[in-house]
Amino acid sequence: MSAASSSSSVVLVTGANKGIGFALVSALLERDDSAKVVMACRSAARGKQALEELPEAYQARIFMLEMDVASPSSVSQAHKVLAESSDYTPLTGIINNAGVGFGKSVEETCATNFWGTKRVCETFMPLLVDGGRVVNIASASGPNYLSRCGDETRIQQLTDKNVTLDTIEQVYAEGLPSDQLGDAYGFSKSLVNAYTRYLSNKTKTKPNNIIVNSCTPGYILTDMTRGMGATNDPEKGVKAPMHLLFTDQDSIGRGWYYGSDCARSPLSEYREPGSKPYEDEEGC
């Protein structure tokens, strides 16, 4: 079975109990009355509370999964639980939405935003149908970080079409200079975008033909951005992820980073939503 031929979607959403993750759960279930969602939350109690805020008709199509993406043992246990559920596997899509925001150390930020994304991909992608989709939630902070980091070698490494996992992990190990420690969030998202490209190169060919992309949801008002000038409701943050999940495979890229307006964007500089989509030097 392929994602294109499957009769309904079964999508795993991490960080699903609030903010953009919760809005994605609602959007997925509203889009198709036969769709199912695996609602992955770090706290089972908070996940249950969020579940009860949804209409009863939606609740019947949700599989609650307790999972802390920053914990290898938690992710492993969650995979074991989900793999035993024939009603919610195989998956047609994975949305890596779980994340932490500004003001934390590089290690703590990347533990969730980068390593957590990588861990979920490696663990749950074997449950995807052929032609399944992976959407990694990134941020404009990633390109913004690269545009001002002043390190041309790092920019080249993280935007290389053929970036390797070894290179990405090497950049992480090098970390940030002392005067850039406030850029931990943007740094983590630049790693997510590079990993997205690496993973796409690895999985885009048959037999699995998995489509992997990343996107920014836009500047959305969530717990992460409260008090920082964000005003857009979480519901406005689902546009790009939904586009990457459901648009015909011939109409989207592979390993690309998309803006909140669903247009391709560069990895090393900010593109204003509504402006011309990015094209690299090969026009692809």
Where are these regions (language model features)?
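C-terminal helical subdomain
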Residues: R119, S214-P217, T222, G227-C284
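Canonical Rossmann dinucleotide-binding motif of NAD(H)/NADP(H)-dependent dehydrogenases/reductases
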Residues: S2-V38
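Conserved Rossmann-fold cofactor-binding substructure of NAD(P)-dependent oxidoreductases
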Residues: V69-T89
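Conserved hydrophobic beta-strands of the Rossmann-like cofactor-binding core
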Residues: V10-V13, P90-I95, V134
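Rossmann-fold cofactor-recognition segment
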Residues: L54-S73
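Active-site Tyr-X3-Lys motif and surrounding loop/helix of classical short-chain dehydrogenase/reductase
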Residues: Q77-K80, K104-A111
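Catalytic loop of short-chain dehydrogenase/reductase
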Residues: G99-E107, D130-K206, T216
